[in-house]
Every structure is written in structure tokens, then in C-alpha cells.
Amino acid sequence: MVGGFVLKELLEGKTIDVRVESVEGKTIENTITIEDIGRGQIIGTRMAFKNYTAFVNTYKEPINSIFSAIPLEGNLSGLTFSGCGDLNPLQNDIPHNVIKTGTRFLFNGAEGYVLGDGTRSSAEKPNLMLTADYKQMDPYYLGGYKTGQGGEVYDTVAIPIPVLNEEIYNNLLITDENIKLPLAEIKGRHLPLGETNYKEMWEGYDLRPQYGRSKCSKCDSCTIEEICPTNAFSNERLDLTRCFGCGLCAHFCKNDAFDMNTGDVDLEIKGNQVNVPIICRQSDRLRGNKLSNQLKKLIETQEFTL
């Protein structure tokens, strides 16, 4: 296990086997739980991006990338994207009227603070540097996510935006259809191919799959167990506390045991009109909504002070 998978299981109270090697070559092995950690603080230097980009592969061969949970097949066979659209905090406060150094928010369920702009942040593509007490976090909101080039850590952020003036209010009115989503070639992610919007990615589509056990053929080698980026499916069981709603299972199960409408999108690429299925999400709107509603309730009960 690496990264987010370890962080999640420690918070769940599970036992972790640790093996480290010193610079002198000495090996130290131990078994630990969260109780063995005196203090834990997560400091994310580049987090909470203002939405992101969609990717396709126009080449023939599959391409490994951090922007796809599995190698993305060629010939425009599928689209992968990141960003929760109009739920994104920075998208709702584009000029940083409210979200500033010292802003309090919920970071995986724990009270956190904005330390400032994240590394490589810019006016066009802002992100944040965030921190919170790791031991106070809810394991549901963070974990590991496997990509075509290794593991990543996913986190969930909910930032309050008090309406202090008309400009802040107007910024909050933005909706998915008005948020542009750049489309890029996954092999050269800075090469634009066109654009779409977040309404095309999210509106009317399912946030979680339905698993039909009766359709499962108990394959000797289960494709979904192998490719699920959060290890949410094993032993013919779908663990919804781990499911990220990425949609891969619905597209790659050989027996169609998973039912999930992740949608498709009409695009213009290099002068051609094409329809491409959305096969992989790297953002989870369900978790984002849950944490936002949790923050709202804490504010209403005055358990969270702005």
C-alpha cells in the first residue's frame, strides 16, 4: 500500500505493517495503529484546484497518465476529466474575495486552515496550500486513487463563502453550463483540442454504480478488482464507502454487472464532430456535496464559526 491507502486505513483503526531501511542499511520493522501516532498534520502544498481539464487520446496506442485511472485507449475511445464544476470553492470565489490565508474550512471532515496559494498557483489556474489535523479527519473523505502512473491521494474540501457584498453573491450564481472545461490531448496535456463545459460532464448522470451480483460470472481474474482505482470492489462485493464514482466498472466489466450512466459528450476535434463516452472521473461530486452539507449544518448550529 502507498500514500492515501495507508492514510485511510490508519484512520479506520486498522493495523499497518511498517518496514523502513536506514541510511546505514539497517532494517526496522514494526506494526502500528493510529494510536501509535502522537501527532499527525497534513499539509498539502497544491490542493483544491479551480476545476481542471478533460483528456482524450487521439493516437492509436493506449497511453499511461496520472489523468486516467488506467491506460487511456486510443482513437477517441473515451474521455477522462477532473473537477466538480459549480461545487468547486475557487470557482465560486474567482477573485479570492473571501478565500484567503487563514480562512477556516473543512478538510476531510476536520477543521483546517488555508495557508495561502499553492505551488504553481496562478490567476488562471489557482490552487491552495491547506492544512488540518490528520487524526481528526474522517476516513470516508480521503484515500488512495490508482492512476496509470502510480498512486495519488484524494481529499475532500468544503470552504464557506460568506456573502458580504454583491460581487461575492454574483460569483456564487455560476452554474455548470457556464464553466468551461478545456479539452486536451492526454499525451501532450498542454495542447488544447477544444472545450466543453461541466454541465456536459455531470448533469443527469449517475454518481454511483449499481452492482448486480446475479450478473457476476465470478471470473478467475476479475478485471474490476484489478482496475478499480480505490480498491472498492473485491470478493464480489462493492464497498460504497470506498467507491469514488469514477465509472470504470460500468465500462469495463465483461458481464455488465455494474449499471451506471456516466454519459457521453459531443465534441469538435480537429474539425471533426465526434461523440465520446465519459469513462473516468477523477473528482467525486458525491463526497463534495456531503462535506458541503456537513459544513452548512455546522454553521447553522454555530459549531463552526466563520
What residues fall within each predicted segment?
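Ferredoxin-type iron-sulfur electron-transfer modules and their immediate structural context
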Residues: 128, 139-232, 272-305
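Thr-Gly-centered strand-to-loop micro-motif
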Residues: 212-213, 238-240
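Short microdomains enriched in Cys/His and/or Lys/Arg
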Residues: 240-255, 268-284
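Long, charge-patterned amphipathic interaction tracts in eukaryotic proteins
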Residues: 2-71, 77
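Long, acidic (E/D-rich), serine/proline-rich intrinsically disordered low-complexity regions
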Residues: 81-83
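Loop-centered beta-sheet repeat module
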Residues: 91-142
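Iron-sulfur cluster-binding cysteine motifs and their immediate structural context
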Residues: 220-239, 248-265
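Conserved active-site and cofactor/substrate-binding residues in soluble primary-metabolism enzymes
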Residues: 23, 50, 61, 223, ...
